[in-house]
Amino acid sequence: MARLENYPEAIRNHLLKLPCPTFDSTPFNRPIPMKEQRVALVSTAGLHLRGDRPFRLGDADHRLIPRDTPANRLVMSHISTNFDRTGYLQDLNVVFPLERLNDLARNGEIGSVAEYHTSFMGATEPEKMESTVVELASVMKKD
């Protein structure tokens, strides 16, 4: 994990000024055991299938990634120069642990792996993404 002190001063100051939400209470829920859960990955790494339109600055949409997608069919088009791709280039599971998720399902540690996963472009304003997220939530609930 990146440490704040490793960033240049300008970026460090910018990050320290970002607003962070505060919550007065914790929502009540009864978690379902992981062995009964169907799990999907949601990433902000700008991943997509080869042949899909690459992400651009400010894109608020997402790209669906089928469960059986081999690592060599995924491309990262994240636009940030500050986004470290080193781990991704060595092992996709660092950024998008689909193989590990399938291992967990095979070992019975989670119920199953969703048919589709998704990736967004990171650093997009949340307000721009709202309609996309509502649509995606519907797709994920059906799965």
Label each PLM-derived region with a short phrase.
Residues M1-D143:
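An N-terminal assembly and electron-transfer interface module characteristic of large anaerobic redox
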